[in-house]
């Protein structure tokens, strides 16, 4: 199938949402959710694979003359490149891969920033040269048109939690885990980030992102990767005992207090905080993921397989 036919196939199969799922007006059952379903997408991908000697030569020859590629650090057994207006990073290093016993080529990109034609170009001209290829990073992004600074986020697991506050004293960024871990969760004010970076103006009143960065073995669990996460609106006045009210209020407003509790007390108050919250946005995230799981799987299949398009 030619590139033109591939492109037509994408358009004719109603795949305008190939990169991003759209907003939906549906709600979970009950009256708790006034927040629209988030927009869901894969926001970053890393694909690794092996170039054999023949394909390494073919790809190197192609890249050295292709105007859409900027190539540097070129030797017989390695090169680095950026493609498609710097939107794609490509690296090949056979010596390093052999010494570290890992695959020798890596391609990094954000699929949301690529057009259908650019996806096809990247797939046909770069990724299809690789053998034994697979994902080593997937970022799952949920964009909410709601102010998530008013919510309390926590995990059932014992992971490091870091919070950065904005000028108004409200949380602006929350991290769960560490950057090099197999799963790293970011919750941040996307509208403020775009404003700070002089990026595209966001027209909606609020735009917050919950981003789940998955690496290595965790990429296989992209459709079941945040069961332990909770984004809540707990009412600290709900518990009958004043002592429990006071402790919940302290835990919600002074994060350092968690570190002073013994394990059984942490478990008790995490359970209590979940019980006194009528809302858990992660339930909305799960339903959104379930609705869009097939479409997201098609994207993964597109990058990993030869051109056998789904029906």
From Swiss-Prot:
Keywords associated with the record: DNA replication, Plasmid
GO aspect biological process, one term: DNA replication
Database matches in InterPro entries: REP-like_C, RepD-like_N
Coiled-coil zones: none
Recorded family membership: Belongs to the plasmid replication initiation factor family.
Note: The nicking site of REP proteins is sequence, but not plasmid, specific.
Role summary: This protein is probably a specific topoisomerase involved in initiating replication. This protein is specifically required and may be rate-limiting for replication of the plasmid in vivo.
Protein's recorded name: Replication initiation protein
Name of the gene: repD
